[in-house]
């Protein structure tokens, strides 16, 4: 059995990791940490874990955590992961990091969007953990930067078009709508029930959302040249899920049928990407609680523009599910281990 620690276990992504890992046949969770709930049993913080996990949440002490685990999931806010990562690396631990701290390959870009990076030398040793694009680079890696939720939905939605050089790189627009868990478990006025319920709003408008450079970095690597896009996130009054609607101008005429075949071929061997049949469109309801990304490419016959719709669960394929998928790849486990559950519907 692989002994695993979850650092930052009292947030939504921490809970989701526990939910998945307790059904994983080759993993034992041996340590959970939380600064705000240290000393409490994890099933006190999350009653859904009663009779399944009674570990006591500990303060984060990197050396102590390392003594208890072979692989560590860091589900911490940005900057917090940077503070402990050097110790984990020096002690030879494998880390799947769910923060933004190691996703951007350029420390200057990270500094411009977040704050100065505390250990830029580790950026070179980290791999961006989007399995459908970077699987071979992930195998055996010591530090995997788990992708953000919006970047996952958009990158998977555009990858076939970019790899085949089919669209105008200056024409990309992505509108993405997320459930409230995307804002985390901390108390925020903007996340209160009365602030969110019965409403639908855009935020981070004008290219200022912090996922923007991550999206552009990955799209540029796929295209082989610089890509910029217009990205507008939205908040929807639902617990979980992301629906991205992506627009681009094709370089030559193409039909919906041709795109559907292109996408089916591109993702034919992928266990967690489902290209929907012609006439079907993704819904967050049909991926909720699962690690699937549902995709449908469509051509607007009037304008000729390509429209790609993708749906994921932001806590699963957008965070914890993908983190476990990365762990499986790193460790040589069956890639779908612990992740074979279908969506929770209705």
Swiss-Prot record:
GO terms for biological process: L-arginine biosynthetic process. One of its GO terms (cellular component) is cytoplasm. Pfam families: Semialdhyde_dh, Semialdhyde_dhC_1. Keywords: Amino-acid biosynthesis, Arginine biosynthesis, Cytoplasm, NADP, Oxidoreductase. The keyword Metal-binding does not apply. Its EC number is 1.2.1.38. It comes from the Bacteria. The keyword Amino-acid biosynthesis applies. It is an enzyme of class 1 (oxidoreductase). It catalyses: N-acetyl-L-glutamate 5-semialdehyde + phosphate + NADP(+) = N-acetyl-L-glutamyl 5-phosphate + NADPH + H(+). The active site is at residue 149. GO terms for molecular function: N-acetyl-gamma-glutamyl-phosphate reductase activity; NAD binding; NADP+ binding. It is found in: Cytoplasm. InterPro entries: AGPR_AS, AGPR_type-1, NAD(P)-bd_dom_sf, NAGSA_dehydrogenase, Semialdehyde_DH_NAD-bd. Pathway: Amino-acid biosynthesis; L-arginine biosynthesis; N(2)-acetyl-L-ornithine from L-glutamate: step 3/4. Belongs to the NAGSA dehydrogenase family. Type 1 subfamily. Catalyzes the NADPH-dependent reduction of N-acetyl-5-glutamyl phosphate to yield N-acetyl-L-glutamate 5-semialdehyde. PANTHER family: N-ACETYL-GAMMA-GLUTAMYL-PHOSPHATE REDUCTASE, CHLOROPLASTIC-RELATED, N-ACETYL-GAMMA-GLUTAMYL-PHOSPHATE REDUCTASE, CHLOROPLASTIC-RELATED-RELATED. HAMAP family: ArgC_type1. NCBIfam families: argC. This is N-acetyl-gamma-glutamyl-phosphate reductase. It comes from Pelobacter propionicus (strain DSM 2379 / NBRC 103807 / OttBd1).
């Amino acid at each position: 059995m692989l002994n695993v620690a979850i650092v930052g276990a009292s947030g939504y992504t921490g809970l989701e990791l526990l939910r998945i890992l307790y059904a994983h046949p080759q993993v034992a969770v041996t340590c959970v940490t939380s600064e705000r709930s240290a000393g409490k049993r994890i099933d006190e913080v999350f009653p859904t874990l009663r009779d399944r996990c009674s570990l006591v949440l500990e303060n984060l002490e990197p050396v102590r955590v390392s003594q208890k685990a072979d692989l560590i999931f860091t589900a911490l806010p940005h900057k917090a992961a940077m503070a402990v990562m050097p110790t984990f690396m020096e002690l030879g631990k494998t880390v799947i990091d769910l923060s933004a701290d190691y996703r951007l390959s350029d420390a200057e870009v990270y500094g411009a969007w977040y704050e100065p990076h505390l250990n830029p030398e580790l950026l070179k040793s980290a791999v961006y953990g989007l399995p459908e694009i970077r699987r071979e680079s992930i195998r055996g890696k010591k530090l995997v930067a788990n992708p953000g939720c919006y970047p996952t939905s958009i990158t998977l939605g555009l990858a076939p078009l970019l790899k085949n050089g089919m669209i105008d790189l200056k024409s990309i627009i992505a509108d993405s709508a997320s459930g409230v868990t995307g804002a985390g478990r901390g108390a925020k006025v903007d996340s209160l029930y009365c602030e969110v319920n019965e409403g639908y709003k855009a935020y981070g408008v004008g290219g200022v959302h912090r996922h923007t450079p991550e999206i552009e970095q990955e799209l540029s690597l796929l295209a082989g040249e610089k890509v910029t896009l217009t990205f507008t996130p939205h908040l929807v009054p639902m617990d979980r899920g992301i629906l991205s609607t992506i627009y681009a101008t094709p370089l030559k005429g193409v039909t919906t049928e041709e795109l559907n075949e292109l996408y089916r071929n591109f993702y034919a061997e992928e266990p967690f990407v489902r290209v929907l049949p012609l006439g079907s469109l993704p819904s967050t309801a049909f991926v909720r609680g699962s690690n699937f990304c549902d995709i449908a490419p469509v051509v607007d016959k009037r304008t000729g523009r390509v429209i790609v719709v993708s749906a994921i669960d932001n806590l699963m394929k957008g965070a914890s599910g993908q983190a476990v998928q990365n762990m499986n790849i790193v460790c040589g486990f069956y890639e779908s281990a612990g992740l074979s559950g279908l969506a929770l519907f209705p």
